[in-house]
């Protein structure tokens, strides 16, 4: 606060408990206003707000200073994708001249032009066909009079998933989905089923799309001396953290999510699914014995604040509970931290003995926020986190690819 006041900026926050509304008054000193208006430009002040439940949000207070007809403004972070963006500017004086933006790859000589859309005093233009991970510059123009402010942005990277073809494996009971000495991205429930001397997710060279292997996820009754529990074959981005024993049954603790900042529009890959009849329902309210089992794949991008277990912080921590499923800490598909989400259920076996292509569109709930993590989960029994499904239900996965527009 002292540094802000020294620069000429002061503020006062108030919270009305009756209306449950907070307000902030920001005051600019005469010296700061003189400095801001000394040359054409836009100044952005980022405002952070935190509520009593420690949930945060932020907004931008944008101040424009210009004696020109139009002023180029910085793009909004969420408007920059891999191959498209929204340019922004402001109308400072009324004019009958046509309003456009000029843009180009930084360092090139040729400008492209696009017509601006005027909404009140705000100018915007959506541009497409941009190059991935490339820096562009742009300027707002009225007639032939261009703003003296040139702004820049860099398109997103089209990041892909490590070991997306499921070619790298090592170990047995548990089997790991990465090479020995390598870096883990994917993990499985093999750490839990190993106590019963079995793996539920393995490499398979007999069913595949490309390369040498696919990932084979098989639902099993993992038991020792006849005592055990149903376990769904699964693979997820993250890490299996622990098995907490409750008598003779085990409850898994999983850290879901890996760092990720790009925004794909879909997850594409290849799958074969064999659905068996549900023979364990563990009182699950979503599926009954005798029903056909359901396979599931979902992708989530979000900016979760993170949860800590064993000294490690993960975007999401999942805790299953065999005896009292209602007390489990399962994934919340309605979380406010989810930015983009897509899922696909397989309610019956896929046709034939080979793999078929699947495509899961990602629907973005927010476009003004960027993700910090990606969660991808696949299961041979959708309700495996309730210890419910059909033994023998099997899902093969291969050649995952993130699709970008």
Locations of regions flagged by a protein language model:
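Conserved structural position at the C-terminal beta-strand
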Residues: 49, 140-142
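Aromatic (Trp/Tyr/Phe) and Gly/Pro-enriched flexible surface segments
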Residues: 152-264, 290-296, 300-302, 308-382, ...
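Low-complexity "stalk/linker" and mucin-like segments enriched in Ser/Thr/Pro/Ala/Gly
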Residues: 2-30, 107-117
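Extracellular/luminal low-complexity segments enriched in Ser/Thr/Pro
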Residues: 30-40
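C-terminal edge beta-strand
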Residues: 56-68, 148-156
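Proline-enriched interdomain boundary motifs that mark the N-terminal boundary
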Residues: 68-75
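Short, flexible loop/turn segments at beta-strand junctions in immunoglobulin-like
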Residues: 36-37, 126-131, 364
